[in-house]
Amino acid sequence: VKLIHAELIKLASLLSAWIAAGLATILPAAVAVLNSRSQVSRGIDAGFQDLAPGVIGAIVIGVVAVSSEYLVEGAESGGGRQITTSLTAVASRSRFLLAKAAAVAVTVALLALLSSAITLTTTSLTDETVSVGTADLPRVAGVTAYWILTALLASGITLVTRSGIVPLTFCIVNMSVVSVSFLLTKLTSWANYLPDLAGMHLFLRDVHGSVDIAPLTGGLVMGLWVVVVAGIGFIVFRRRDA
């Protein structure tokens, strides 16, 4: 618990993490307002579809939680890196990574729940055709799981690269600008089982894909991707010098 608390404090000290939290909270609600003004019916996924862009904030948090450890500090701090101090304080690299993953998961979970409450309330107030109730709670849990798994996936990639540039660029572009995963579905149906597409089935019911995936199956597939990527990151981290 102490290690998780320490990681939460480190995360809270990062300006980029606060900016990401703001994005995760505000962006989905803003998208919901804009969509409510359109004349197009959004169907069963109204409100929940608006929560998808908020995962950008989760990605940023997952990345900076790891990449900040490798940033070279200022001259007044000796020009060292946080990772050296962290591994000096925590002898076990396994415990260090587990605490960091837990801190990321807790932070992102709280943001997902807060963003879901704000966005779905906004959707209900701005679109009279949409009604959100207790029956949608499993989908809110799905959104939360999707955000957490995406953040952990981003952290795993960053463990390998040690830099936030590559994972941030790829993940954000893939999630918001041009979905490489979706384009790949035009070539092979197996692309539907890539983590971002499979995970969306956790909370969306009208996913435009060539394969029908149940919510639980989508979550398990995405979870497996996270285990594999995080496992590779863990092995690389264990064998590499700080």
Model-derived regions: residue spans:
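Helix-loop-helix units of permease transmembrane domains in multi-pass membrane transporters
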Residues: 66-105
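Helix-capping/transition residues at the boundaries of transmembrane alpha-helices
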Residues: 10, 86-88, 154, 158-159
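Short loop-to-helix capping motifs
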Residues: 13-15, 91-93, 162-164
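Secretory targeting signals
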Residues: 16-17, 21-67, 97-161, 180, ...
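Aromatic- and glycine-rich beta-strand/loop motifs that create alpha-glucan
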Residues: 1-25
